[in-house]
UniProtKB/Swiss-Prot annotation:
GO terms for molecular function: calcium ion binding; calcium-dependent phospholipase A2 activity; phospholipid binding; toxin activity. GO terms for cellular component: extracellular region. The lineage of its organism: Eukaryota, Metazoa, Chordata, Craniata, Vertebrata. Keywords: Calcium, Disulfide bond, Hydrolase, Lipid degradation, Lipid metabolism, Metal-binding, Neurotoxin, Presynaptic neurotoxin, Secreted, Signal, Toxin. Disulfide bonds join 44-136, 46-62, 61-117, 68-110, 78-103, 96-108. Belongs to the phospholipase A2 family. Group I subfamily. D49 sub-subfamily. One of its GO terms (biological process) is arachidonate secretion. Residues 1-9 form the signal peptide. Expressed by the venom gland. This is Basic phospholipase A2 beta-bungarotoxin A5 chain.
């Protein structure tokens, strides 16, 4: 099945452009019946914060993404949540543009890797909105 998403740029707050771009990548890679928001509070790492061990492959995608953003901040002095970048969604993959080592390219590669990981990982309904105090220590 092919999902078609009509995305308008008029309502994008500039300070959150990267999050919009990441959301668009996720929409491109996940199954049609899912929404990007279903990934925002999943497991121990998908969403704000994170602790403990990832509970499955999908949660591991978010764990790796958190660490990738952490490296971008610490090693490269980037701000991943506001950093915009150039990319293309084409032929079932995502292409990041920009010179290697630039903040835009580093953050794009973090988001690209995670979005593709989401597309290749099973979504387990029981891992949405879990009790993180109990399962993520």
């Amino acid at each position: 099945a092919v999902c078609v998403s009509l995305l308008g740029a008029a309502n994008i707050p500039p300070q959150h452009l990267n999050l919009y771009q990441f959301k668009e990548m996720i929409r491109y890679t996940i199954p049609c019946e899912k929404t990007w928001g279903e990934y925002a509070d999943y497991g121990c790492y998908c969403g704000a914060g994170g602790s403990g061990r990832p509970i499955d492959a999908l949660d591991r995608c978010c764990y790796v993404h958190d660490n990738c953003y952490g490296d971008a901040e610490k090693k490269h002095k980037c701000n991943p949540k506001t950093q915009s970048y150039s990319y293309k969604l084409t032929k079932r993959t995502i292409i990041c543009y920009g010179a290697a080592g630039t903040c835009g390219r580093i953050v794009c590669d973090c988001d690209r890797t995670t979005a593709l990981c989401f597309g290749n990982s099973e979504y387990i309904e029981g891992h949405k909105n879990i009790d993180t105090a109990r399962f993520c220590q």
